[in-house]
Amino acid sequence: MEKVINQIKPRTPEEKILIAIIQQTMEDAFELSKSTNLSMAEIQQSRNWFRTKACEIICDHLGTTQDHIVKLYDKLSEKYKTGQINQTQLRFAIRRLELKI
């Protein structure tokens, strides 16, 4: 059986910024941002963002699909809500998101 090794693709500065946008939006959606006081409306807006045209455009630039990002978000959300992962593990997963894109 062969082992699959995940390697980080070399990313352009633009791609790094786009990945950071997705990561920050996920942190906001999960209320992980400690440096900002987000209102519930802003948190809900972050949660809804993954199903918007803006997200689709960013995904296209990154060579992935919006559906893939939504599935990643939904999977993390389910694991976090059911206690399978804690806040620290969730934050770690979001920071390593580029490995999944």
Q: What are the functions of these language-model segments?
A:
Residues M1-I101:
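Charged interaction scaffolds used for protein-protein
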